[in-house]
A protein has these predicted regions:
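Short beta-strand/loop segments at the ligand-binding rim of alpha/beta enzyme cores
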Residues: 56-64, 146-153, 218-235, 302-312
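Active-site glycine- and acidic-residue-rich loops that bind
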Residues: 158-170, 198-200, 204, 228-249
Length: 362
């Protein structure tokens, strides 16, 4: 019996989604602070057989938490403690910023989806750096002798920075956060920062990724920090192929696909479309994104083969969804939106489901 969906319907369904998010995040942190997740580590920790090596890093599970839940690195160890094989924080920007005006987070409960126009609200790279360093030290101590959860850091452009100065803004985050990160993500695909998606164009993306790679190498000379780029599902296939070719050319370590979509039509939404239109602009995530996310994954696998890692995200809810992505060529899989609907046992359930699926194939 799954208790959390009932709990969600009673306590969270009628609550402002952003307030519910903060309460839920506080709850996960409290589970760690009072020692519950550590006491139940045997339950939450992924089975050893799920460990996988990607981009030269061993992950305890192929399933992790996508960027967006922990925007500032405040709950990395707590989230790692409930079963995620990796926790990707952010998006972090060079400067602290409040994000877009509220309300900016909306649920489409019937579709198990969310629309957000958060706008990279975060405390900035300078504040996030020490948090990541502390979390990394905690995890290295707590998981000594076993595969520890991995920390990804997702960086983006500060809203007030003009596009012509975007590279330097990304470099502020790069030099501050690379030494603490296990891997780095260049986010050029959020629809909620004006002009950001134009950086996905090859003529803009090439110098940006080149500069970030060089700076990451400079500030971390003794440890290779894998570099990935996160792309939008709204790119046409030809553009995705171009990005894949560029990633191979620049010897990136991976591609994360996909971010949220600005589309509303063709997603099979069952929610009241009048309500959807009233919500307005923002990126849609969750179950309706699954078909396009799978399409992009298969296209990327065809184009890059095993040359780069592919991290698939978008519409992932169940262990079967995760295994489907792995079977389609993903090296790692991420989720976020379903976490809001499924609750704190979600990652543990997925890891247990993956073990059952794999054992059934033997």
């Amino acid at each position: 019996m799954r208790i959390y969906p009932t709990f969600f319907n009673i306590f969270f369904k009628g609550m402002d989604p952003e307030k519910a998010h903060h309460i839920g995040f506080w709850g996960v942190q409290t589970l760690r602070n009072v020692g519950i997740t550590r006491a139940l580590r045997k339950y939450f920790q992924p089975a050893p057989e799920l460990a996988t090596t990607v981009m030269g890093i061993t992950f305890p599970s192929p399933f992790g938490l996508a960027a967006g839940f922990d925007k500032g690195g405040k709950g990395i160890a707590a989230l790692a403690g409930i079963g995620f094989g990796h926790v990707e924080i952010g998006t972090i920007t060079g400067q602290a910023q409040p994000g877009n005006p509220q309300p900016r987070l909306f649920r489409l409960v019937e579709d198990k989806a969310v629309i957000n126009r958060m706008g990279f609200n975060n405390d900035g790279a300078a504040a996030a750096g020490p948090r990541v360093a502390a979390a990394r030290a905690d995890l290295e101590t707590e998981y000594r002798g076993v595969v520890r959860p991995i920390i990804g850091v997702n960086i983006g452009k500060t809203k007030v920075v003009e596009l012509e100065n975007a590279i330097e803004d990304y470099l502020i985050s790069t030099r501050t956060l690379t030494p603490q990160a296990d891997y780095l993500v260049v986010n050029v695909s959020s629809p909620n920062t004006p002009g950001l998606r134009t950086l996905q164009a090859i003529e803009s993306l090439r110098p940006l990724l080149t500069a970030v790679r060089e700076e990451a190498n400079r500030v971390s000379p003794n440890r290779h920090v894998p570099l990935t780029v996160k792309i939008a599902p709204d790119l046409v296939d030809e553009d995705i192929i171009e990005v894949a070719a560029l990633a191979k050319e620049l010897k990136l370590d991976g591609i994360i696909a996909t971010n949220t979509t600005i589309a509303r039509e063709g997603l099979g939404l069952t929610s009241d479309m009048t309500k959807v239109k009233e919500i307005g602009a923002g990126g849609l995530s969750g179950a309706p994104l699954k078909p396009r996310s799978l399409e992009v994954l298969r296209l990327l696998k065809r184009e890059i083969g095993d040359d780069l890692a592919i991290i698939s995200v978008g519409g992932v809810t169940t262990a079967e969804d995760v295994q489907e992505r792995l079977d389609a060529g993903a090296d790692l899989v991420q989720g976020y939106t379903a976490f809001l609907y499924e609750g704190p046992l979600w990652a543990a359930h997925i890891n247990r489901g993956l073990v059952k699926l794999r054992r059934a194939r033997r």
